[in-house]
């Protein structure tokens, strides 16, 4: 049972300015179109192959698709051609490849840099503020990449205080870089922690289970 409307209302109560991305990974195109009919316009997908299967034959002109999962370098070309934004850029090498592929097809691609705010070994993302700042500087040399801001995933386990600590750390970093690079997007918060993320300054939350139900 798809219920985008209810979740959108809950998010709006917390902040009317926050963008709600419907995480549609593993969900059918039928479910995605039902969410679209209920007002969803931004969808988050984890895998490039799945994006190909769902959207290669087209989609409504006002529907946006964001890649939110890890991107392997051999999938960059396909990803750049299919999505509006890549939210999981975790290395300068990947950023450079995205820039090259976007330039080849003369497409400006939006990106977010992923920050590993919790320092967990099993997570991807830039681990230090210095590395992340270097990636920001490098992005200025890429004519077809539009760096919009940062993304982070809260610590495993849904401990509210640990989530808050990680989100506030990312928010401080975002605030320090915003005046230099014109950042506008701080993507933090998923189904279990989005309210805390909004309290900490998130401008985009990514919610799947509450909209689409459990895994298909």
Regions found by a protein language model. Give the residues of each.
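Conserved alpha/beta-domain cores
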Residues: 1-192, 198-200
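Expand to "…catalyze enediolate/carbanion chemistry for C-C bond making/breaking, isomerization
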Residues: 195-199, 207, 211-216
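Conserved, well-ordered active-site substructure
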Residues: 204
């Amino acid at each position: 049972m798809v219920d985008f409307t209810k979740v959108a209302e809950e998010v709006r109560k917390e902040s009317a300015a926050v963008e709600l991305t419907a995480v549609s990974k593993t969900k059918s195109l039928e479910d995605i179109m039902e969410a679209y009919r209920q007002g969803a316009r931004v969808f988050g997908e984890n895998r490039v192959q799945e994006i190909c299967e769902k959207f290669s034959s087209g989609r409504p002109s006002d529907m946006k698709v964001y890649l939110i999962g890890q991107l392997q370098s051999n999938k960059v070309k396909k990803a750049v051609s299919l999505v509006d934004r890549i939210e999981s850029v975790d290395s300068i090498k990947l950023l450079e490849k995205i820039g090259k592929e976007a330039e080849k097809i003369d497409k400006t691609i939006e990106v977010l840099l992923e920050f590993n705010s919790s320092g967990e070994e099993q997570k991807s993302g830039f681990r230090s503020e210095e590395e992340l700042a270097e990636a920001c500087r490098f992005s200025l040399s890429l004519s077809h990449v539009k760096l919009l801001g940062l993304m982070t995933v809260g610590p495993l386990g849904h401990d509210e205080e640990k989530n808050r600590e990680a989100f506030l750390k990312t928010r401080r970093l975002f605030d320090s870089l915003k005046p230099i690079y014109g950042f506008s997007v701080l993507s933090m918060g998923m189904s279990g922690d989005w309210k805390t993320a909004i309290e900490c300054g998130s401008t985009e939350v990514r919610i799947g289970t509450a909209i689409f139900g459990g895994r298909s």
